[in-house]
């Protein structure tokens, strides 16, 4: 039985990366440095733009984060692909929260737009995931739209984020 809380701490997210949060067969979040959130502040089975589920998570920004030292030297900015990956991470986390089993894999995204950036002077990134559909057949898949905000300002949007849970990834 999945412990379905409305929020999760950094320690909980790290437990997920070790396969301890959603059980031995549940999906895992990546470990640091690829874990792109510090906490999940809200998870619901309803709500969001489509009333089919909503997740909100946060990442605290500080100038010592690993990507600022290499992307780019003299012009530090968080890579946009990390924000996109964070949204995929949260779709997979939600599928585990619903009780889904398997290994999470990003399956695609319909459209991504970047209209801002995350600099080392920022304080907080907020991720918002609005679920459109959950497929729970042979393949468990989540379809959602996502938003990334920095210090309350919308900077990325993604439409039709897709993540699937697979029992066997050898042929993937």
Curated annotation (Swiss-Prot):
One of its GO terms (biological process) is unsaturated fatty acid biosynthetic process. The active site is at 71. Its EC number is 4.2.1.59, 5.3.3.14. It holds the Pfam family FabA. The keyword Acyltransferase does not apply. It comes from the Bacteria. Keywords: Cytoplasm, Fatty acid biosynthesis, Fatty acid metabolism, Isomerase, Lipid biosynthesis, Lipid metabolism, Lyase. Belongs to the thioester dehydratase family. FabA subfamily. Homodimer. This is 3-hydroxydecanoyl-[acyl-carrier-protein] dehydratase. It comes from Salmonella choleraesuis (strain SC-B67). The lineage of its organism: Bacteria, Pseudomonadati, Pseudomonadota, Gammaproteobacteria, Enterobacterales.
